[in-house]
Regions:
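FIC/Doc superfamily catalytic core
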Residues: 1-200, 204-317
Length: 317
């Protein structure tokens, strides 16, 4: 659908009809390609987890700062995907409980995450930490002023209901692979949030943070770990494959009636490829990183205060 830019407000929104997100997830039938890709990644990831344990070697503080650096790079890369600037420091990340208290989510926490990314970036959202009050569409604006609308976000009257359903999906436990496997659940958490598009700006950035929360929670459940920060961050990889990333999302109808299993599987396979790339990159990085010497400057009592020590303990215990 093409319209001149000054006519965009005259478009009649083709917004998705309200439906239950767990039902969307349960309709997914994994392709042979995704299942094969997944088994290969799991084997590589388990080797990577062993390497993490070897590098930690009982020194929790050093590993904390290593992962804080990784978290900082992830947030910056996530902003770069939509050409935003992101400015913050490890100290700011540790100053609040946004990332350390829990891997669970709620509508309040999602709004707090949105507020965090808006306050630390050049976000254009006029409603910081609040759901949008206007229709939202995703597409292209061309040099001649024409507009191509790819898809519409949820109707503003349905956002709260969609988000309630989203929380139910996020928390759902099931033996089905789409819920039980951390890689798949995280990828679908990312997709569904973007498709709801609850905020006026920052939906992609929030979705990638939620993906990391979901992934970390899933890894803890499957491997009996107690991580609070994601052991894999794929925004750098997404940024390098941005055209495919956008196409995979745009190709998926956000609907039960028009559900497209092949399109969803292409999205899952894309995200698995991003994780696969990151596993190999991080494996080599950890092998070539002397964590103790790299972070020695951080270990001063003058730098690590009592509050931060408390968070360090929460991170690993």
């Amino acid at each position: 659908m093409n319209k001149k830019g000054d006519e965009i407000m005259e478009l009649i929104p083709n917004e998705p009809k309200l439906f239950e997100l767990p039902e969307f997830a349960d309709k997914i039938r994994l392709s042979d390609n995704v299942l094969y890709h997944l088994s290969d990644i799991i084997a590589s990831f388990e080797d990577y987890l062993k390497l993490i344990n070897e590098c930690t070697n009982g020194n929790n503080i050093d590993m904390l700062y290593y992962w804080l650096d990784e978290a900082e790079e992830e947030l910056i890369s996530s902003c770069n995907i939509e050409k935003h600037k992101f400015v913050f420091s490890n100290k700011e990340l540790m100053s609040g409980d946004l990332f350390f208290e829990s891997l669970n989510i709620s509508q309040k926490r999602i709004k707090d995450i949105h507020k965090f990314i808006c306050e630390h970036s050049d976000s254009k959202s006029s409603l910081v930490g609040e759901y949008r009050k206007k229709p939202a569409w995703v597409g292209n604006v061309y040099q001649d002023g024409s507009v191509e609308v790819k898809w519409w976000g949820a109707n503003i009257e349905d956002i709260e209901k969609f988000m309630k359903s989203y929380i139910e999906f996020y928390k759902k436990n099931s033996l089905k692979e789409i819920h039980a496997n951390p890689f798949l659940k995280a990828a679908l958490s990312h997709l569904l949030f973007v498709k709801i598009h609850p905020f006026g700006d920052g939906n992609g950035r929030v979705s990638r943070i939620i993906q990391n929360l979901s992934f970390t929670s899933g890894i803890n459940r499957v491997y009996d770990t107690n991580l609070k920060l994601s052991p894999l961050n794929i925004s750098t990889n997404i940024h390098m494959n941005q055209i495919t990333y956008v196409r995979r999302i745009n190709d998926i109808p956000f609907s039960i009636k028009d559900f497209n299993n092949d399109a969803v599987n292409r999205w899952l396979d894309f995200v698995l490829s991003m994780y696969d790339e990151q596993i190999h990159f991080q494996t080599e990085k950890l092998k070539n990183t002397q964590i103790e010497s790299q972070n020695k400057a951080f270990l001063s009592e003058a730098i690590i205060n009592q509050s931060e020590k408390s968070k360090i303990n929460k991170l690993f215990k």
